[in-house]
Every structure is written in C-alpha cells, then in structure tokens.
A protein has these predicted regions:
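Domain-level signal for soluble alpha/beta catalytic cores
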Residues: 1-114
Length: 114
C-alpha cells in the first residue's frame, strides 16, 4: 500500500478495506501513515482455497494491526471475498469454517479490548 498512501489519504471516504493475509500487502506499519479519521476494514481471513486461518492466527493478525490503530478504528473482514464464479473455488463448508473462525476471533478480541 505504500506507493498509494497519498491517494488513499485524499479519498473522501471514512472507511478503507485493506487485505492483509498475503505478504504482498506489505507491513501493517503503513497504518501509521493513514489519516486518523479512517476506519480500516482489516482483511484478516484468507479467501484462498484450502487455507483456513485458525482463530489464534486471526487474533494475532488483528493484534498486529492494534499496534498502529485503536480498536474502534478496526472492523474485521475476509480478504477480497468468496466470489462465486471466480477462479478460486472455495467450498461453502470451507467458507463457513473461515467465517466461524472470524466470528470467534472477533468475540475474543472484543472481550479483551472492549
């Protein structure tokens, strides 16, 4: 995201969704350089077939973001999406497991940080 930080900060929006389950996304330290009024939809669950992030992995990913953002600025979401018809075929059972893990991670994080 570093090459487009200037453009992101100029957007007339209150919320950005950013993917962070892939190393290509870069370091979450990028959050230090975003406007403080921006909420971040943190991509914390992989949409790749066969990769089911554990609850602990999701919590750890969010806690990394919390080094740079307050809890109130973060919403959790999967990276990208589970688009039907896309090249990445993810079974509905796998999608359900991924989302259940995200919900449990959210519950744990709320308990700890609310």
């Amino acid at each position: 995201y570093t090459p487009i930080l200037g453009q992101l900060n100029r957007l007339k929006v209150n919320h950005l969704t950013m993917e962070f389950t892939t190393p290509a996304a870069g370091d979450m330290a990028v959050f230090k350089h975003l406007r403080e009024d921006l909420e971040i939809g943190l991509g914390c669950v992989s949409c790749d077939p066969g990769q089911v992030d554990s609850v602990d992995e999701i919590v750890a990913r969010v806690e990394t973001a919390l080094r740079y953002l307050t809890p109130a600025r973060i919403t959790l979401n999967p990276d990208c999406g589970f688009a039907p018809g896309s090249a990445a075929k993810v079974s509905l059972d796998e999608v359900a497991t991924k989302l259940k893990n995200e919900v449990e991670a959210s519950r744990r994080l709320r308990e700890k940080y609310s």
